[in-house]
Amino acid sequence: MISLSIGQGEIGATPLHLANLAATIANRGFYYIPHMVKETPDSLLNNKYREKHFTMVEPRFFNDIIDGMHLAVNAAPGSGGTAARAAVKGLDICGKTGTAQNPHGKDHSVFICFAPKDNPQIAVAAYIENAGFGGTWAAPIASLLVEKYLTDTTSRAAMEKEVISWNLLGNVPVKKR
């Protein structure tokens, strides 16, 4: 039971589960049923996907979690924030890094986030297999997605170039552009 509290042992969560968790935290306890839609007029979206579902946790208890997630990304350099590489000036990203142990090789890099802190518009989960620490790999990738979604551009050209240059497929051949 103790190992479950730190995400180890017999626990399974897909990236969609993790993104929905980030959205639930961002919404202070409510969520929508996740669904995939390629294209539809808004009026045709099934009502069950518009219905708010609530956790049994009171909304006020989410504030401390959100503050901690905000500090993980936006804390002053050297203060221990594990997701500093996800910080984007003016976006108030809140996030949580994770490193999923892998008994068969290098650990997996995990990061969930949402933004902006006080008016959430997007939640993202990045899960990069065999990549190592969440703050090193998954956080920068997720933050670029958040930034592009919220601003329709990216302001960190060096970070974007770095991420594009990574070979996260290990020994799988990658065709260079």
Predicted regions, residues:
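Active-site beta-strand/loop architecture of penicillin-binding DD-peptidases
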Residues: 1-53, 60, 66-156
